[in-house]
Design a protein with these regions (language model features):
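Conserved ATP-binding/catalytic core of the eukaryotic-like protein kinase fold
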Residues: 1-184
Length: 184
């Protein structure tokens, strides 16, 4: 969390690569994440406000601060009915569909990446953490992102069979749809 002072005052989330973690691979994934988020304009996806680099050259992005709890925790704690839970789930599906229409696969849909926050007392789910997102076609950044052969990318319990194969081949929008099914 950070305090933005210009051009307006507001609390924001600031994502910055930690010192010593700025390998080429980490920087490339970071830039892909901020590019993926910058392409989105959906009420159920956390918004990016600004991107840049510090004076020392460390890349960062400033985004909407989403305060809330995991979607599963929200549903349990508030004892939502099935129709109420499905209403939240439908909003998440629309957000993922928006990402797909923008050419982005999230690849890590899971409860901790869907935060429910309250807006005027109304629950609003927000899809967050596009850190391992992948472009459907082409690249999200000019920097090359290397995924090592048989490198594990994602959360096993929510992975599609294609994603779990570790080849990276065959991963497309169905990967996110599979994860949504597991979440449901």
């Amino acid at each position: 969390m950070a305090e933005q002072k210009e051009p307006v005052k507001r609390r924001v989330a600031l994502k910055l690569i930690k010192l010593g973690m700025d390998t080429r691979q980490v920087v490339a994934r970071f830039e892909a994440e901020r590019q993926a988020l910058a392409m989105m304009d959906h009420p159920n996806i956390a918004k990016v406000f600004d991107v840049g680099a510090t004076e020392a050259g460390r890349p960062y992005f400033v985004m909407e601060l989403v305060r809330g709890v995991r979607i599963t925790q929200y549903c349990e704690e508030n004892e939502l009915t099935v129709p109420e839970s499905l209403n939240l789930f439908t909003l998440v599906c629309r957000a993922v569909q928006h990402a797909h229409q923008k050419g982005v696969i999230h690849r890590d849909i899971k409860p901790s990446n869907i935060v429910v926050t309250l807006h005027d007392g109304v629950p609003v789910p927000k899809v967050i953490d596009f850190g391992i997102a992948k472009a459907i076609e082409g690249d999200l950044t000019e920097q090359t992102i290397y995924t090592q052969y048989q490198q594990f990318i994602g959360t096993p319990a929510y992975m599609s069979p294609e994603q779990a194969e570790l080849s990276g081949l065959g991963v497309d929008t169905r990967t996110d749809i599979y994860a949504l099914g597991v979440l449901l």
